[in-house]
Amino acid sequence: MRTFLSILFLSAFFMNSFSQKKDMISLWPGTVPGESKPKAGPVADTKTKDKVFRYAEVTDPALEVFIPEKSVSNGSAVIICPGGGYNILAYDLEGTEVAAWLNSLGYTAFVLQYRVPGKKEGALQDAQRAIRVVRNNAGKMGIDPDKIGIMGFSAGASLSARASTRFNERTYQAVDKADSLSCRPSFTMLIYPAYLDQGPENSLTPELTLSDKVPPVFIFETAVDPYCNSAFVMGKALRDAKLSVEVHILPQGAHGYGLRKGTRAGETWPLLAEQWLIETLNTGK
C-alpha cells in the first residue's frame, strides 16, 4: 500500500510543487563571507531550451521553505542541494520538485540556493550555515533538531558529502547565536553524486575525512553514469570505516534525471529513499 501511494504522489506532486506553503530565509543577514559583490536576487539562466529551470548566479544565499500539511508532518526536515557542476543550480529538477515529494511524505523541505558560479568553498559555508539556521528555528517550525538531514544531486551531492564529513571544520566566523549550534546533518542522501573520486587513482577525495560521527548515508547511482565512480568509492569508504551506508546501483539511467517520470532510475530512487528514511528516522506511520 505504501509503495502504491508513493507512485500516486510521484504522479501528482509536479502539479502542486509551487502551490505548497513556502517562504524564503536569507542565510547571511550582513555581508556574505569572503564576498565583495553586493547581494542581489538569484539570476535565472534564460539560455537553456530544455525543461529545467536553472539559476546561473546566486549572490545572496537562501533557503526556500516548503512546509507539509500538518496532517502528515513527521517533525523531520531535509535540506536539498540542487546540482549543476557548482556553476548553476538545476533548481526545479533537483530542488523544488524534490521538496514537493518530501512534503508529500511529511518532511519539511528546504531548497538551498548556494553560491554559484565557481564558489565551491562558499557553497560549503552556505550549507553549514543552512543546517545551523534550520536547527536554530526547529522548535518554532515543529522540527526535531536531531532529525535535520541533507541531500543533493550531482554537484549538490558533492556539497552534501562535504557537509556530512567536514562539520567540525569552522569555515566562517560566527554571525549570530545559530552559529553556536552543530552543523552536522542527522542523515545524508547522495543521488548520482559527482566529484567524490578526486584522490589518487580515482579514490575518495581527500577533502572528505571520515569519522565515527558521519551520519547514516543513502547513495543512489546508475552504472552507466560517467560519474558513477563517485558512488562506488564513497560507498566503499563508508563500508570500510564500518559506518552506516546503503548503496543502490541500477544498470541504466545516465545522469541528471531528478525524480521525473520516464526513466527507471528517476522512478526508483524515491521509493528506495522513502523506505530508508522510515527505517533511519523511525517516521513510519
Which positions does each model-derived feature cover?
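Bacterial Sec-dependent N-terminal signal peptides
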Residues: 1-23
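N-terminal cap/lid segment of alpha/beta-hydrolase-fold proteins
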Residues: 20-72
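Short beta-strand element of the alpha/beta-hydrolase
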Residues: 74-83
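Catalytic nucleophile-loop/oxyanion-hole region of alpha/beta-hydrolase
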Residues: 89-92, 111-145, 262-266
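Short amphipathic alpha-helix adjacent to the substrate-entry channel of hydrolases
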Residues: 91-110
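Primarily recognizes the serine-hydrolase "nucleophile elbow" in alpha/beta-hydrolase
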Residues: 125, 129-212
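Short beta-strand/loop motif that positions the catalytic acidic residue
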Residues: 218-221
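C-terminal catalytic histidine-bearing segment of alpha/beta-hydrolase fold enzymes
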Residues: 235, 239-285
